[in-house]
């Protein structure tokens, strides 16, 4: 490769490959920045560049410090940015010794301090030129505490601890290159070293608001540091002469316009400040005050003044009648209150009473006001109506200078007619007939003269009041039809009578079928027990055998044949101890059989003891595991709890019921059930088919293989198919015992989720010192989908197919499909080659590209020392 190829005038990146590590050399128009390095103390490809402006060591591990140490030995000043504290001692031959030497060389350079995190995210200027541009470094993570942890690990000399400290406390930064030309795009590089994915996510989410150039896909050089434009505030327009605010000076500078009479009499606004009578008031509308000026209360509120002297021009919402002249008398108050009468009632029924007549003339309230006469209502015929007044109306209610109103009286609810007997005890009370009512004097129809009426007004009748009961008079000589029978209580028990002891089913005389039997007669029992016995008409004669004619009974000199066995009275046979008869083939009762089933308590106790032994053995095995102190304590408590639960009455009863359900010796299958529990099968006797899922496996397996019954081939096929499917599902999962977290231990890490997408030009996938991607497929998909970069450096050593597929799935989530993405793998593998061949169409559809791995790209550099070949990949950034 010719030397002029190295001196490029275009921003690019050289991805340097090696057997143990990778590094990145950035070329920003001749400004070189080295990110990382190699373990060998050899500058390598960096020796062919002109000058290195700075070295960034985000993870100061042993695999990164060799190149930096070789560059410092050349004697040129080289700023090295790493987050470490001053070393006191370092172990010889360790990474701490090299870091201490780098720190001593760096201390001789002016104004080179270790970059530390600042919540304000200031820009650390690395290079600045008016002809080329500005190179800045923003620190997102890495403070004093992180520096102490890394320094302690380096001083200890344990490289494993150094790598762990670099992953958890390493420096994370953003490198920003702003070209001198304002219309060119900036270059954004994520510097993460070997930091974990969670640390990267937390750092970016915190810096999202302070670094606005990370929130858009493309940023110009002039807009890189500009904030989001705030909403424009409208400026106040220059006021016109008619829109100037009212003056508040003491002397009037211009004459006051004549007052315009108000169209109506609106309610005057009051002001807390006293208004001066000599201060003039302008009639022009005030212009709205600017936003910055705060108007005072005195200028906003209208000042009180007499309506005849200084009326103000106010907008009237609706046109109304003009105001009356000054000499005209004011309208009466009754007319102004016409729209609001004192009371109004609506007629809801027939009116009982005369129509209200015109009111009496009332005294005027004042000389200036006089009530207008109300229209007189038409007179009605007084013969058909009556007036019934309520107590709530008084004569004073009609002398209140208000408008006349209609009096509506609601008639009471008529009571139902009663059929009462004429009372003879009160002859002085007379009944008013309809004719007397018609001859009654006419009622006064003038409501105003009600006070002069001397007639007594009957009190109003409450229609909702329940009438009081009146005692019914006792009228002698009435007919039987007028008598009302007293109500009869249907639930009252009647009084006892003489016939209460009468029982219709109890005979009062002896039954004819049960006569008195003489002592010398025979009673013959009938076959039916419900029928009465039959009494023979002959007396009983005890049988007596006579010589050879045994079995013959002579009754009244006649011989009768007696059946065998009935020569003597029948004596019942006594039962045995078990409740059965001696000469009877009676089966043993079921109750006795159940009592015999409970005799196997010894076997149940043995099975229970065996189960407890199994639990004890399991707890002992768990205690023998090599666990830490907290987990061992947790397992010990769990095993003790299992042993206690196994001895509970509920557990023993459950085990007994399971054993009994599989069969017992009383049913003839005890031997088969016992053989099935011990793992053996008796082929001579067929095991009955119980519930298929109840007795498929043994109750206690004793650590041996489970023995299944071979009586249902169809069910065996189903179980085998399920087992095969479960093996396929669990093939990718290791057979590890997942114990719950011990009390006090750290909870499992939650999946990493970025708050929003971020845009870069170069990023490196989180990796470890072995050049392997340190995140799983889910984390890699989240990283690619949210950290959207044009160029992605992928540590592809021993990468899996799931991780490669996660990169493709993450790229598919980008909203801007035209935004390209170039993946630069560091190592080649058959998995990577096969993935590239199978997904060529998907790459083209999603604008994704996989370049040739770095280890497959060779570049030769010719110099005076000769030609040297390097593993590197060059990628343009602009």
Curated annotation (Swiss-Prot):
Keywords: Cell projection, Cytoplasm, Cytoskeleton. It is found in: Cell projection, Dendrite; Perikaryon; Cell projection, Axon; Cytoplasm, Cytoskeleton. Residues 416-425, 480-496 have a biased composition (Basic and acidic residues). It comes from the Eukaryota. Residues 241-268, 278-293, 310-321, 328-339 have a biased composition (Low complexity). One of its GO terms (cellular component) is cytosol. GO terms for molecular function: actin binding; microtubule binding. One of its GO terms (biological process) is dendrite development. Residues 224-425, 456-518 are annotated as: Disordered. Interacts with dlg-1. Belongs to the MAP1A/MAP1B/MAP1S family. This is Microtubule-associated protein homolog maph-1.1. It comes from Caenorhabditis elegans.
């Amino acid at each position: 490769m010719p030397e002029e190829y190295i001196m490029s005038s275009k921003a690019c990146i050289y991805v340097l490959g090696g057997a143990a590590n990778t590094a990145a050399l950035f070329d920003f128009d001749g400004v070189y920045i080295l990110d990382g390095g190699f373990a060998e103390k050899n500058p390598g490809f960096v020796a062919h560049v002109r000058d290195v402006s700075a070295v960034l060591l985000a993870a100061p591990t042993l695999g990164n410090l060799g190149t930096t140490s070789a560059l410092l030995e050349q004697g040129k000043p080289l700023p090295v940015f790493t987050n470490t504290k001053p070393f006191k001692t370092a172990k010889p031959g360790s990474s701490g010794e090299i870091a201490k030497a780098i720190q001593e060389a760096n201390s001789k350079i002016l104004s080179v301090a270790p970059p530390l995190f600042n919540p304000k995210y200031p820009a650390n200027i690395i290079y600045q030129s008016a002809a080329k541009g500005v190179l800045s470094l923003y620190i997102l993570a890495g403070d004093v505490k992180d520096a102490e942890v890394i320094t302690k690990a380096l001083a200890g000399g344990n490289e494993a601890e150094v790598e762990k400290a670099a992953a958890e406390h390493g420096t994370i930064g953003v490198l920003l290159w702003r070209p001198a030309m304002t219309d060119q795009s900036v270059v954004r590089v994520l510097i993460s070293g070997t930091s974990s994915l969670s640390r990267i996510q937390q750092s970016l989410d915190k810096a999202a608001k302070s670094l606005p150039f990370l929130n858009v896909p493309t940023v110009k050089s002039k807009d890189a540091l500009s904030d989001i434009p705030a909403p424009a505030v409208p400026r106040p327009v220059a006021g016109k002469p008619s829109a100037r605010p009212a003056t508040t000076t003491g002397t009037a500078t211009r004459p006051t316009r004549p007052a315009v009479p108000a169209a109506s009499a609106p309610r005057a606004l009051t002001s807390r400040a006293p208004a001066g009578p000599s201060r003039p008031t302008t009639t022009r509308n005030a212009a709205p005050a600017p936003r910055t000026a705060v108007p005072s209360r005195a200028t906003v509120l209208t000042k009180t003044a007499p309506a005849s002297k200084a009326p103000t021009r106010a907008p009237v919402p609706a046109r109304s009648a003009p105001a009356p002249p000054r000499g005209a008398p004011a309208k009466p108050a009754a007319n102004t209150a016409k729209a609001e009468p004192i009371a109004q009632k609506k007629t809801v029924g027939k009116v009982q009473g005369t129509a209200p007549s015109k009111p009496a003339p009332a005294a005027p309230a004042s000389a200036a006001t006089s009530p207008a006469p109300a229209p007189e209502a038409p007179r009605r015929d007084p013969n058909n109506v009556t007036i019934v007044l309520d107590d709530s109306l008084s004569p004073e209610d009609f002398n209140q200078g208000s408008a006349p109103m209609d009096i509506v009286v609601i008639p009471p609810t008529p009571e139902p007619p009663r059929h009462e007997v004429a009372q003879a005890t009160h002859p002085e009370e007379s009944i008013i007939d309809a004719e007397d009512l018609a001859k009654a004097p006419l009622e006064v129809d003038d409501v105003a003269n009600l006070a002069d009426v001397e007639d007594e007004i009957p009190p109003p009748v409450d229609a909702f009041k329940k009438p009081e009961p009146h005692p019914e008079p006792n009228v002698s000589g009435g007919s039987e039809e007028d008598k009302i029978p007293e109500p009869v209580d249907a639930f009252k028990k009647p009084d006892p009578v003489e016939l209460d002891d009468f029982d219709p089913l109890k005979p009062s005389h002896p039954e004819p079928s049960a006569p008195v039997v003489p002592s010398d007669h025979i009673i013959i029992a009938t076959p039916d027990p419900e029928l009465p016995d039959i009494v023979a008409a002959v007396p009983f004669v005890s049988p007596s055998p006579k010589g050879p004619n045994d079995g013959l009974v002579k009754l009244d000199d006649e011989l009768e044949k007696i059946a065998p066995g009935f020569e003597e009275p029948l004596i019942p046979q006594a039962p045995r101890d078990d409740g059965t008869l001696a000469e009877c083939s009676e089966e043993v009762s079921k109750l006795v059989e159940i009592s015999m089933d409970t005799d196997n308590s010894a076997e149940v106790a043995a099975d229970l003891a065996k189960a407890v032994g199994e639990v004890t053995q399991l707890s002992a095995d768990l205690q023998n595991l090599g666990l830490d102190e907290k987990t061992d304590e947790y397992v010990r408590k769990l095993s003790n709890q299992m042993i206690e639960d196994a001895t509970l009455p509920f557990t023993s009863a459950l085990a007994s019921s399971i054993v009994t359900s599989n069969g017992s010796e009383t049913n003839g299958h005890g031997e088969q059930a016992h053989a099935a529990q011990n793992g053996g099968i008796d082929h001579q006797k067929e095991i009955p088919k119980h519930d298929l899922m109840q007795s498929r496996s043994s109750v206690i397996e004793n650590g041996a293989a489970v023995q299944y019954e071979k009586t249902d081939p169809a069910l065996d096929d189903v179980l085998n198919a399920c087992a095969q499917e479960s093996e396929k599902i669990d093939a990718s999962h290791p057979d590890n015992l997942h114990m719950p977290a011990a009390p006090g231990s750290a909870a499992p890490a939650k999946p990493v989720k970025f708050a929003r997408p971020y845009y870069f030009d170069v990023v490196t996938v989180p990796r470890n010192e072995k050049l392997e991607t340190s995140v799983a497929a889910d984390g890699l998909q989240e990283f690619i989908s949210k950290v959207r970069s044009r160029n992605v450096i992928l540590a592809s050593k021993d990468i899996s197919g799931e991780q490669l597929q996660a990169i493709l799935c993450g790229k598919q989530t980008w909203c801007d499909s035209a935004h390209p993405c170039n993946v630069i793998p560091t190592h080649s593998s058959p998995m990577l080659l096969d993935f590239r061949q199978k997904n060529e169409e998907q790459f083209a559809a999603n604008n994704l590209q996989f370049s040739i791995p770095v280890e497959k790209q060779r570049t030769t550099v010719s110099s005076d020392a000769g030609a040297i070949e390097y593993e590197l990949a060059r990628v343009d950034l602009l």
